[in-house]
């Protein structure tokens, strides 16, 4: 399973990218607004740091508005993926953009039907929201398993980006369910490679080594 960073904090992306395990980045209007910087400038800077897909979301509501925005965003960098909301107008936009060879990430998916519709429209990625589904008592892992089964059974090319990840348990859970990708907030990313027992073990090793050298 691939790891994407769900942030637009360029300094954090640069710091974590050096680990060699960041496969892409996702953003949305909320995340971009926190940075207080020009949208295009931020996306271009991220694309210079990360080689993998970088999702940048449209803000238009009609098909024509989304397609116009998407065509412009797609010009910014070869690894830009245009994020489109799961709506009737969004599906129409994805269908058109797919014909033009523009990569898309259909976001805010909460049902199998929505995911399948996005696949049929030609979405490059589909993003089911794990945390938000759990908030309403829905089994998000079952959704991801079902979507992966549909992709494999019918031969769709879409990849699943598990979004709304709120902790290590979500990352591990979606990996077990067959998500192709988990997009993870930068604040959660450290949990992928840290553990108190690891720290304690290192401390013990160093203490024992120091005692050995003093003999």
Curated annotation (Swiss-Prot):
InterPro entries: Aldolase_TIM (IPR013785), TAL/FSA (IPR001585), Transaldolase_3B (IPR022999), Transaldolase_3B/F6P_aldolase (IPR004731), Transaldolase_AS (IPR018225), TSA/FSA_arc/bac (IPR033919). Belongs to the transaldolase family. Type 3B subfamily. One of its GO terms (biological process) is carbohydrate metabolic process. This is Probable transaldolase. The keyword Transferase applies. One of its GO terms (molecular function) is transaldolase activity. The keyword Transferase applies. Its EC number is 2.2.1.2. Pathway: Carbohydrate degradation; pentose phosphate pathway; D-glyceraldehyde 3-phosphate and beta-D-fructose 6-phosphate from D-ribose 5-phosphate and D-xylulose 5-phosphate (non-oxidative stage): step 2/3. NCBIfam families: fsa_talC_mipB. Transaldolase is important for the balance of metabolites in the pentose-phosphate pathway. It comes from the Bacteria. GO terms for cellular component: cytoplasm. SUPFAM superfamilies: Aldolase. It catalyses: D-sedoheptulose 7-phosphate + D-glyceraldehyde 3-phosphate = D-erythrose 4-phosphate + beta-D-fructose 6-phosphate. Signal peptide: none annotated. It is found in: Cytoplasm. CDD domains: Transaldolase_FSA. The active site is at 83 (schiff-base intermediate with substrate). Keywords: Cytoplasm, Pentose shunt, Schiff base, Transferase. PROSITE patterns: TRANSALDOLASE_1, TRANSALDOLASE_2.
